[in-house]
Amino acid sequence: MSGRGKTGGKARAKAKTRSSRAGLQFPVGRVHRLLRKGNYAHRVGAGAPVYL
């Protein structure tokens, strides 16, 4: 008996777009996808579409 009681799991937070996190108007997720698909580099960092 571990005696943990009725512990509820944490509820998942509401999805927040990367554009709203960065305070931008253009779609950061879409730009990131296009950077990856466009063969611009082997690896694309998470901040690349924000600073572009």
UniProtKB/Swiss-Prot annotation:
Designated name of the protein: Histone H2A
The keyword Nucleus is assigned to this record: yes
Main location: nucleus
Residue(s) carrying N6-acetyllysine: 6
Quaternary context: The nucleosome is a histone octamer containing two molecules each of H2A, H2B, H3 and H4 assembled in one H3-H4 heterotetramer and two H2A-H2B heterodimers. The octamer wraps approximately 147 bp of DNA.
Region (Disordered): 1-25
Subcellular location per the Swiss-Prot or TrEMBL entry: Nucleus; Chromosome
Phosphoserine PTM positions: 2
Gene3D superfamilies: Histone, subunit A
GO biological process: defense response to bacterium
Modified residues (N6-lactoyllysine): 10
Cross-link (Glycyl lysine isopeptide (Lys-Gly) (interchain with G-Cter in ubiquitin)) at residue(s): 14, 16
In-chain residues carrying the UniProt-annotated modification N-acetylserine: 2
Function of the protein: Core component of nucleosome. Nucleosomes wrap and compact DNA into chromatin, limiting DNA accessibility to the cellular machineries which require DNA as a template. Histones thereby play a central role in transcription regulation, DNA repair, DNA replication and chromosomal stability. DNA accessibility is regulated via a complex set of post-translational modifications of histones, also called histone code, and nucleosome remodeling.
Family: Belongs to the histone H2A family.
Statement: the UniProt record of this protein carries the keyword Secreted: yes
